[in-house]
A protein has these predicted regions:
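Terminal, non-globular segments
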Residues: 1-172
Length: 172
């Protein structure tokens, strides 16, 4: 049951991520600003803490493959990034424990680093032609700010998913 709930939430978040790309770029003060939150990525990171690393690794692989196939520009960038950051999240929370502020900071920092990872790979392969500081100012920082707004919603979803898991264990 928990796996089905996680999968459905993941699909909805993947769709929401894609829907946000249709709104970007937005022109603000005659400058194009990109708001691309990584809702699915943040949810997978939160699953690492609340549902366990095995479950989050499974969904990191599953949704990584789905995104790589759907986007199709470079295969492997999402699956590798998701797996690497799930491992990093698991390692980070051996140090930070489950403090909400520390967790929010680590998840948003990982979101920023994942965005930089994608930028680095795409720029090395010459798929993107945006200068680094423009990328930081016009895409990475606005995306993290929007992600921060949605973090609380994802946090509640992750906790509810963990409660489904605990309820199933208690029943069995």
């Amino acid at each position: 049951m928990q796996m089905i709930v996680i999968f459905i939430i993941g699909l909805i978040l993947m769709y929401a991520d894609m829907a946000f790309t249709s709104f970007s770029p937005m022109t603000m003060f005659s400058v194009e600003v990109y708001f691309v939150p990584k809702l699915l990525f943040m949810y997978i990171l939160l699953l690492t803490i609340y549902a366990g690393p095995r479950i989050s690794m499974l969904f990191a692989i599953l949704f990584g493959v789905m995104l790589d196939v759907y986007i199709g520009s470079l295969y492997g960038i999402h699956i590798f990034g998701f797996i690497a950051f799930v491992i990093f999240m698991q390692t980070a929370f051996r140090v930070f424990y489950r403090d909400f502020v520390a967790m929010a900071f680590v998840v948003l920092l990982n979101t920023f680093l994942f965005d930089l990872y994608q930028y680095a790979v795409y720029s090395v392969l010459d798929f993107i032609a945006m200068p680094f500081f423009d990328y930081i100012a016009l895409r990475a920082i606005p995306s993290v700010l929007v992600s921060a707004l949605f973090f609380v919603i994802l946090y509640v979803l992750a906790i509810q998913t963990a409660k489904v898991r605990k309820e199933l264990r208690r029943i069995n």
